[in-house]
């Protein structure tokens, strides 16, 4: 649940500054200083997702397989960086909270395949958190 809340806060900040994420390539080509900043931001997100994946997958000792851990963390970071563009491209109308919680669920889902028998419980817990948080934000 702490991971979910952490990612929710992170995605809320990203959503508030979504103009940086919706046209990243164009923005970085036009403004080199933004390119450097986005590169730094991606590096920080990779570090964060590596720590997050390490924590979430501690029960299956993925740290014994650093290459796997790096792949999971990179997938999580990619999802974080490009989720808002993906949502825009799908064209499905979503409230900001729905967009944020869908992103969080997607980021966390990168860990699920490594959880073995715990995978179903992990998804169920994520879905319960998602439903509870969306319910508290309903009009």
Language model features: what each stretch is:
Residues 1-3, 30, 34, 65-69, ...:
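Residue-level recognition of alpha-helical structural elements
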Residues 21-28, 56-60, 83, 87-91:
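Secondary-structure edge/capping motif, primarily at the C-terminal ends of alpha-helices
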Residues 34-59, 70-85, 102-113:
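Amphipathic alpha-helical packing segments from all-alpha helical-bundle domains
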Residues 59-77, 126-136:
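Charge-rich, acidic-biased intrinsically disordered regions
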Residues 9, 20, 30, 121-128:
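Bimodal feature
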Residues 1-19:
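Hydrophobic alpha-helical connector segments
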Residues 89-139:
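C-terminal peripheral helix-coil segments that are non-catalytic and often amphipathic
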Residues 15-36, 50-55:
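Amphipathic alpha-helical segments used for helix-helix packing
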């Amino acid at each position: 649940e702490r991971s979910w809340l952490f990612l929710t806060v992170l995605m809320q900040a990203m959503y508030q500054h979504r103009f940086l994420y919706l046209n990243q390539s164009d923005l970085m080509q036009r403004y080199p200083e933004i390119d450097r900043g986005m590169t730094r931001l991606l590096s920080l997100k990779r570090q964060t997702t590596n720590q997050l994946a390490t924590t979430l997958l501690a029960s299956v000792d993925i740290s014994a397989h650093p290459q796997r851990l790096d792949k999971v963390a990179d997938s999580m970071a990619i999802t974080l960086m490009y989720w808002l563009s993906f949502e825009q491209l799908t064209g499905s109308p979503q409230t900001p909270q729905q967009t944020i919680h869908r992103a969080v669920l997607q980021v966390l889902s990168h860990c699920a395949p490594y959880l073995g028998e715990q995978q179903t419980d992990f998804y169920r817990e994520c879905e319960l958190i998602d439903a509870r948080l969306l319910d508290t934000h309903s009009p």
